[in-house]
UniProtKB/Swiss-Prot annotation:
The organism's taxonomic lineage, starting at the top: Eukaryota, Viridiplantae, Streptophyta, Embryophyta, Tracheophyta
Subcellular location: Cytoplasm
Amino acids binding Mg(2+): 9
Family classification: Belongs to the AdoMet synthase family.
Protein name: S-adenosylmethionine synthase 1
PANTHER family referenced in this protein's UniProt entry, alphabetically: S-ADENOSYLMETHIONINE SYNTHETASE
Length: 441
């Protein structure tokens, strides 16, 4: 049997880039909670004891940017200079301007357009991916790397491993078999964890705790054997971390946010963007389409692409590839997708409830993945949703409720992934049952 190795990585919520993603999505949540029509393009950067929030925001919301920065940093665990940043005493810089009027009139007509007529906020192409190798319909290498990172945070915050600090990275290499286009995991080849720690713990203690409290609960025993390689803090020392160790910037972990290198990526980041930005809403709707294809039994693995022009509601193209695993021809799957989903941005916002903020909804996506990191029960996967989705940018915002901020809705997306999360705020993870007739044997 011919096999191959494939690797995916993840980073913790205390990684400086993920810190910035979470702040940007916390700002988005705050704007949408008070004003669902907020137009948000929020960037964040950070270095030693300094955070800068900048970008273009047009909103009726009253947003205390400094308060959001301090709270987000504190919640992650950056509470002193020793761990990489002092949330309560760090310097906060704010440089926010309004959205360009040229963009505003072209996309939403200064809020005068109907949802179905709202144009895409920019040009671009987005990809959705799904595979039947895990219950989440996500790649196993990505799922394991992401869950290891989330577990590191859990055992740090609950006191199981008090020597842990917020920053950290994980990486998992899986040995796969290609079953006529479908990916079949055979075993875990290598596990790599590099985690920030205090100055008192020994390398032996780190390795023992990571194996017992992080790896063992996350990686199923069936994937581990005597040949599995473990690299646990291989550099030997990781005391200095967070923004003190490296500068952070929003939007630099786009592969971690999606599929761990599987499928494809159009290049656009998610965090800090309202649903008129198709980098985010377009990627969410094609994930739902791809996931629905696999969950409905149309294919074992597939990728869906959509593309847009700025100011134009209708997508320029929609593409489906089942990697040879489709039960019917790809052209027929594509036709089902076009008949079932509405790719207009305004309708995506409605159908996926993407204008609803608050309660950390988008903040949840900003760490540990936007897709596929929690098993969704069959009753949720198969529940009946609207018969047709609209992919025009303005309608995406309405259909996915992407204008709703507040309560950390978008902040949730900024760490640990935007896809595959078992959370009612992740509306793009609900599978649509697709109607099709199985060919006669």
């Amino acid at each position: 049997m011919d096999t191959f190795l494939y690797t995916s990585e993840s980073v913790n919520e205390g990684h400086p880039d993920k810190l910035c993603d979470q702040i940007s999505d916390a700002v988005l949540d705050a704007c949408l909670e008070q004003d669902p029509d907020s137009k948000v393009a929020c960037e964040t950067c950070s270095k030693t004891n300094m955070v800068m929030v900048f970008g273009e925001i047009t909103t009726k919301a009253n947003v205390d940017y400094e308060k959001i920065v301090h709270k987000t940093c504190r919640d992650i665990g950056f509470v002193s200079d020793d761990v990489g940043l002092d949330a309560d005493n760090c310097k906060v810089l704010v440089q926010i301007e309004q959205q360009s009027p040229d963009i505003a009139q072209g996309v939403h007509g200064h809020l005068t357009k109907r949802p179905e007529d709202i144009g895409a906020g920019d040009q671009g192409h987005m990809f959705g991916y799904a595979t039947d190798e895990t219950p989440e319909l996500m790649p196993l290498s990505h799922v394991l790397a992401t869950k290891l990172g989330a577990k590191l945070t859990e055992v740090r915050k609950n006191g199981t491993c008090p020597w842990l600090r917020p920053d950290g990275k994980t990486q998992v290499t899986v040995e796969y078999y290609n079953d006529k286009g479908a990916m079949v995991p055979i075993r875990v080849h290598t596990v790599l964890i590099s985690t920030q720690h205090d100055e008192t713990v020994t390398n032996d203690e780190i390795a023992a705790d990571l194996k017992e409290h992080v790896i063992k609960p996350i990686i199923p025993a069936k994937y581990l054997d005597e040949k599995t390689i473990f690299h646990l803090n291989p550099s030997g020392r990781f005391v200095i971390g967070g923004p003190h160790g490296d500068a952070g910037l929003t939007g630099r972990k786009i592969i971690i946010d999606t599929y761990g290198g599987w499928g494809a990526h159009g290049g656009g980041a998610f965090s800090g963007k309202d649903p008129t930005k198709v980098d985010r809403s377009g990627a969410y709707i094609v994930r739902q389409a791809a996931k629905s294809i696999v969950a409905s039994g149309l294919a074992r693995r597939c990728i869906v692409q959509v593309s847009y022009a700025i100011g134009v509601p209708e997508p320029l193209s929609v593409f489906v590839d089942s990697y040879g695993t489709g039960k019917i021809p790809d052209r027929e799957i594509l036709q089902i997708v076009k008949e079932t989903f509405d790719f207009r941005p305004g309708m995506i916002s409605i159908n996926l409830d993407l204008k609803r903020g608050g309660n950390g909804r988008f903040l949840k996506t900003a760490a540990y993945g936007h897709f596929g990191t929690g098993k969704i029960p069959d009753r949720e996967i198969l529940k009946i949703v609207k018969e047709t989705f609209d992919f025009r940018p303005g309608m995406i915002s309405i259909n996915l409720d992407l204008k709703r901020g507040g309560n950390g809705r978008f902040l949730k997306t900024a760490a640990y992934g935007h896809f595959g999360r078992d959370d009612p705020d992740f509306t793009w993870e609900v599978v649509k049952p697709l109607k099709w007739e199985k060919p006669q044997a």
